[in-house]
Amino acid sequence: MAPEPLSAAGQNLIDTATSVINGIPVSDFYSVASAAISDDGRVFSGVNVYHFNGGPCAELVVLGVAAAAGATKLTHIVAIANEGRGILSPCGRCRQVLADLHPGIKAIVIGKEGPKMVAVEELLPSIYAWDKDYDRI
């Protein structure tokens, strides 16, 4: 599946996450915002919670916010770093969780030509399918 050019909905997600992160005072604890859209058009946002013993990335916070609101399928997601650092590609853990919980979701990432939308499965080659590891279940 080829990457898609940025859509109006994708730009809306970038704008939403940028607004969220720009509205938070500069902090070592909240440095990334994320926004996602559900298949029914609702937009959800959240921020990471950094702590030295670990904490959720912004994308994972958004998954929880969306689930709490009853969203069952997210179609697109983006993460924006603070201090003008812009779009971040999801980390490996987030890629795996996104692929497991929302198969087919597209992440907005930066390409050579600017932002583009890419299926998360393409960002995580040879994806681990935990539900297919029958020897472990």
Curated annotation (Swiss-Prot):
Q: Which domain of life is it from?
A: Eukaryota
* The entry's keywords: Antibiotic resistance, Hydrolase, Metal-binding, Zinc
Locate the residues binding substrate.
31, 85, 128, 130
GO MF annotation, one: blasticidin-S deaminase activity
One GO cellular component assignment for this chain's record is: cytosol
This entry's Enzyme Commission designation comes to 3.5.4.23
Enumerate the Gene Ontology biological process terms. cytidine deamination; response to antibiotic
Keyword Zinc set for record: yes
How is this protein organized at the quaternary level? Homotetramer.
Q: By what name is this protein known?
A: Blasticidin-S deaminase
Question: Which species does the entry assign this protein to?
Answer: Coccidioides immitis (strain RS) (Valley fever fungus)
